[in-house]
Amino acid sequence: LCDAWAQGDARIRVIHKKNGGLSDARNVGLDAASGAYISFVDSDDYIAENFIETLYDLLHEYHTDISAVHWKLVYADAPEVPAPLSSRNVTLFQGADAIRELFTENTYACYAWNKLCKRELFDTIRFPVGRIMEDLGIAHKILFDAGQIVYSDEPLYYYYQRDGSILHTDC
């Protein structure tokens, strides 16, 4: 399926790689990336139709290095998609403020998947391979290096919860 899409659209590139885990896959993607921005979507999650557009618009409207949106937990037995917000609240952070928020309120969160980042933030940073919650291993570095971050409370990322996922398996 992916190969067929890539044949029909020059913007799509497929990378075939032996499974090395989530961090390894993200790092391969970072190494191959040529665009100005990076965003991640985990394999069992899904996003709103306007996810990337909203993140891009926020990043440019507020002149930030990172834009982020809220997420909604979605369960296998009730995969509802939330109705769009009639209005959204937007918060701006400086890098150190975002780190403080990350480790206290956790509104912003350390996840890689609800954000759009300028690619250069990843120039010297890669995800630690073989770790669960690898996002936390680099979140503080990315947030610190970011000049300014914009966060919207609009839930546009759907974090799928299932029994067999990485975070729901016994270690």
Identify the meaning behind each predicted range:
Residues L1-C171:
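Nucleotide-sugar donor-binding/catalytic module of glycosyltransferases
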